[in-house]
Amino acid sequence: MSSNQRVLDRVSRELKTFGFGSAGAALLTGRCTLHSELELKLADYTGQESALLFSSGYLANLGAICSLVSKEDWVFHDRLNHASLIDAVLMTGSRHRRYPHLMVPSNPAPIGRKSFLITESVFSMDGDKICPNSLSNYCIENNSTLYIDDAHGFGVLGEGQGVAYELKNLSGECPEILIMITLGKALGSSGGVVLGPKRIIDFLT
């Protein structure tokens, strides 16, 4: 994708219209119609309600997790998660537990405490892949939010939709789910995106 001539030609045309940089923060002058159009298209493509662009996948993980998780919350995360997920969890100051790779946590959060389960979909170092059904069931049973870093699944697995494709095809009830995808892997560009329920994406915005 990064060297596809059609992509390069389109980028060249758009640069002449919109310029090279945003010249401001997103809340002021840093967004244009292209940002909104891309968010809408990515949300529709993955079957999610809404999407929010970030400048990188690393910052998407930090921004989303640090905004949603408080010190009073509990976080359960795979022991082989990417550094961006580990950094984000540590920055929240929350109570956190690392569970065995590709398993589910052995104990839930205390009653009355909000909890999150954070994992990658495809682990970058060895290619291991999660079982979305097992994690979804755990989150339903324990009222946890499921956060999935799909950097290495999006654009490759699930007809290109990544883990979102598998989650859409799960039968029965689904937990609250957030998915982070990157634009710099299979799509050959740059940036990160957090996808999920509109009310959460609006909060992050």
What are these regions (language model features)?
Residues 56, 76-92:
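Substrate-binding/gating loop at the entrance of the active-site cleft, primarily
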Residues 64-83, 105:
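Conserved PLP-anchoring active-site segment centered on the Schiff-base-forming lysine
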Residues 163-183:
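Conserved active-site segment immediately N-terminal to the catalytic lysine
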Residues 180, 187-205:
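Conserved core segment of the aminotransferase class I/II
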Residues 2-3, 156, 164-167, 192-198:
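Short beta-strand-to-turn element immediately C-terminal to the catalytic PLP-Schiff-base lysine
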Residues 8-56:
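Conserved N-terminal alpha-helix of the aminotransferase class I/II PLP-enzyme fold
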Residues 97, 101-148:
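Active-site phosphate-binding strand-loop segment of PLP-dependent enzymes
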